[in-house]
């Protein structure tokens, strides 16, 4: 599944995973992306949307 929101273009965030001995390895935080059916220009379409856009009401689900 895509890890980018089609509405706000939110993508993954990057940082370090730090162990107990303080060694660092790279990791990523993926946004919570859901597949939502909505109407775009009157035609039904599936979009990959983050949950913050769904909560904000930026997409109409049906």
UniProtKB/Swiss-Prot annotation:
Any one GO molecular-function label of the UniProt entry: structural constituent of ribosome
Annotated Gene Ontology cellular component terms: ribonucleoprotein complex; ribosome
Keywords from the named record: Ribonucleoprotein, Ribosomal protein
Disulfide bridge map: none
Keyword Cytoplasm: no
InterPro entries listed in its UniProt record: Bacterial_rp_bL28, Ribosomal_bL28, Ribosomal_bL28/bL31-like_sf, Ribosomal_bL28_bact-type, Ribosomal_bL28_sf
Statement: the UniProt record of this protein carries the keyword Ribonucleoprotein: yes
Any GO BP: translation
Top-level taxon of origin: Bacteria
Family membership: Belongs to the bacterial ribosomal protein bL28 family.
Name of the molecule in the record: Large ribosomal subunit protein bL28
């Amino acid at each position: 599944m895509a890890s980018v929101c089609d509405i706000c273009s939110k993508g993954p965030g990057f940082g370090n995973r730090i162990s107990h001995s303080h060694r660092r390895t790279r990791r990523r935080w993926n946004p919570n992306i859901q597949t939502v059916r909505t109407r775009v220009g009157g035609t039904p379409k599936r979009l990959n949307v983050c949950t913050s856009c769904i909560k904000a009401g930026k997409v109409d689900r049906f």
